[in-house]
Structures are given as C-alpha cells and as structure tokens.
Amino acid sequence: MCNPSTTTTTTGSENQESRTGLFLDLFSINSFEPTKRNLRHCENRGSPLMAEAVTEAKSLFTLAFPIAVTALVLYLRSAVSMFFLGQLGDLELAAGSLAIAFANITGYSVLSGLALGMEPLCSQAFGAHRFKLLSLTLHRTVVFLLVCCVPISVLWFNVGKISVYLHQDPDIAKLAQTYLIFSLPDLLTNTLLHPIRIYLRAQGIIHPVTLASLSGAVFHLPANLFLVSYLRLGLTGVAVASSITNIFVVAFLVCYVWASGLHAPTWTDPTRDCFRGWAPLLRLAGPSCVSVCLEWWWYEIMIVLCGLLVNPRSTVAAMGVLIQTTSFLYVFPSSLSFAVSTRVGNELGANRPKTAKLTATVAIVFAAVTGIIAAAFAYSVRNAWGRIFTGDKEILQLTAAALPILGLCEIGNCPQTVGCGVVRGTARPSTAANVNLGAFYLVGMPVAVGLGFWAGIGFNGLWVGLLAAQISCAGLMMYVVGTTDWESEAKKAQTLTCAETVENDIIKAVVASTIDGECDEAEPLIRITVLY
C-alpha cells in the first residue's frame, strides 16, 4: 500500500544546496480522504441493510439495463447479417457461417478477452480517484490489441488452406477466406471499440455506447441493402457492411464523447508511456482472455460434436438454433456481470470493502432470479420457438426436446456469469479461468462425450454435458465469491492502482541538468516515488 507520509531530504554541500535539492516525494493517499469521510458517514448513519441493498440494486440496474439494450442491438445486427447470407444461397450461408465461427474462435473472442484485462485496472483506478491511470490503460490496451491483430490477420489470410487441411469443402473454404479478408477492418475497429466501452463503463458512462450501437443498427440494414442487393457484391458485401457499420459506430462514439466532454475528467493525451509499463495489464489480460475463450470455444466444439452424431444435418442445424437461443438469453446475465464488475471494482478502489460485498450479494440474487425466469421461458416455448428459425420437423423435435435442458443450464449459467463478473472486479481473472477450465473441460466435456456417444443418448446427451458444466461452474464460482476476503481485496486494489502509478513515475524520473541555467529552489533535482 502507498505510504501516506511525505519526506523531504537534502544532500551535498551548502553550495549545492543553495542551487538544487534532492526530494524523496513519497506518494500520498490524501485523495482517499473524502472517500473515508463518506464511508464513516455511511457507517454512522445506521441505515438498514435492506435500504442499502435497494440502493445498490438501483445502481446495478442503471448500469445493466443500457448494457443489455446494447447487447440486444448487437444480436439484432448479427441476425441481419445472417439473413442476407441466407438470401444469397446455401453455399454463401455455409461459407459465411464457417468464416464467422473461425473469426469468433481466432479473433473476436481473443480481442474481447484481452480487453477485459483493463476492466479491473480502470474500475479500481476510478474508485481510487486515480483518473490519469484510466486513459493510460486505454492507450496501452489499444496498442496491445493492435499488436495482437497481426498474427490474427495472418491466420485469416490463410483460412482457405487451413479449412481444406481440415477436410472442409474447397468452395466453402475459398468463400470463407474472402469473407474474412474483407472483415479485417472490422477486426481493427474492435481494437478501439472494446477498450473504449470498458473505459467508459468503468466510470459508469453507458448511454453513449448504447446510442452508438442503436445508430449502428439503423445504419447496418441500409448498408446491407445497398452493398448486397443493389451493388450485388454478394458475400463480400455482407462482410463490408459489417466493417463499415462498426467503423461508423466507433466514429459516432468518439465524436459524441468528445463533443459532450465526458472524457475530460479522466483524459490525458497519449504519450510514450503507453508503449511501456505493460506488466499489470498483461498479468490481467492473459487470464481474462483464457477465461472468455474457454467458455466461448465450448459452443463451437459442441457444433463439431454434433457433426459426428447420426443425421448430422439435423443435429448441427438444431444446435445452431439452440446456440442462438442461449446467446439471446445470455444477454441479461452478461449485462449484469459487466455492471457488477464495474461496481465491485469502483468500491474496492475507493476502499469500501463492505459495499463491494453487498454489491456482489445483490447481483448474485438478481442472477438467480434471472436464471429461474430464463428456465421458465425456455420450457414454455419449447414447442414453438424452433418455428421461428425452421419448419423442418426433425430439427423442431430435437429443439423441443433440448430446450428444457437449456433452461436448466440457465439456472446455473446466470449465477456463474455474474460471479465471474464479481471475480473480474476483484482483479482475479486467473481464478475465473481455472473455474471455467475445470467446469467445462474436466467435467462438462467428459459427460457430454460419454452420454452423447458411449451411452448412445445422442443430441440431448451433449446438452446434459453442458448442464453438468454449468452446475459445476456455478458451484465453484459461488464458493469463490463466498470465501472472498473483501478487506484483503480492498488493500490489493490500493496496491494495484498505486503500483501502476509508481511504475510510471519511476520510469519518468530524471536528473535535471543545471549547467545551462539556474534551477529554481523549489524544483527538485530528482523526484522519486517510493512504494512500501
């Protein structure tokens, strides 16, 4: 923790002392004093726990609702792209689906996971009133993601050869590569979009992102109509439309935030500091990426396993319908997860562990209720939901049989997703990664393969495997959250944000030369920030 004391020391002869001074300027935490006074005020006023919980619930809802709207808009945009691919023909739909799956596995999931490494840094720094750290972390993350785009781009340029090597149809593989090449601008815009969203969300600023997403959705449909239907660019037009839409979203978001001055309290111009001092970010980004990818990739593996079952055409199609369904239901717990991660990070950064614990508790209760509602929804629409996507009787039968299992999965998925958000807010992404690895691949995968193939249950056996994974993940995550030492996490938050500041100050420490001019007596020759 940063030492609150300040010490000034002089050295050298009297002649030297008259010209220069050597200052050991220890970092002060005076900026925390208002927070401490507020905390004492809250503790002394004796407000009931229920009233505090209601207040916290309102704060979470205020954050989560616009995030959910944004996610639903993105879901709608994806559906529009799939619609235009389907209108082009079976070959284009298959190639586009393969390209999107490859892009998700090798690109979008990776960038999304790596960007989440900045979330605890930004939310805790904002709570600790270390505003400069927010923009510095934003700059570093953008540079980091741009660097990561280089190997991803190489993969995308060679997806045709990779797909043929994996025994995919050569025509489908060639078209998939075309789609991905024209999606590269979209990949690059994500290196800006993800960090900006997190930078704003850490400050509780959500509405600009929602407005930008809504504007993008309005822009996306005419862009597809113009490029695909009018110019007849085919599959290439769908990819270009997605790229142009995201460029429009980023431009709208940046212009809106800049014009409204929302960036002003925490903004600093980019400097060479964004090219160094990456250690704290990398320590959080790596495990965050692993955690996201382990869960994201599971669903892609499920599609591959469906292709090995009897009548793969129907099982793969039914799995696609159900994954679209669970993606829709996932919008709500994931939005709550982002909200609770921000709130927990803010409170720990402000050194309010009791409030952080209350936030986590309220969010998990919300998640449990959300899971029950999702399960009831899945069960009630089991015989009708599939008709939105297809009229094939066999696909409809598979979908109707698996939807109740999907609903049970949501009872576990909602709490574990929100629990993962709590863990992210405490800057422990490696814990979430370990939980996902154990639950999905050491429990869920063996159960899915065993029931789906060895026991002969087939399609439903794969979904029972997912149910086992979600139950295990929820149980482990609740244990992690329940055993969290909140006082210790608050201290770690102070250390994390202070250590980042100290690292930058040490890097920038210089010895001032006084040969060419007089040095003001109040200006130190060396300024050193010390972390105890």
Curated annotation (Swiss-Prot):
GO terms for molecular function: antiporter activity; xenobiotic transmembrane transporter activity. Disruption phenotype: Enhanced resistance to bacterial pathogen PstDC3000 in RNAi mutant. One of its GO terms (biological process) is negative regulation of defense response. Its main location: membrane. One of its GO terms (cellular component) is late endosome. The keyword Phosphoprotein does not apply. It is found in: Endosome membrane; Late endosome membrane. Belongs to the multi antimicrobial extrusion (MATE) (TC 2.A.66.1) family. This is Protein DETOXIFICATION 51. The gene is DTX51.
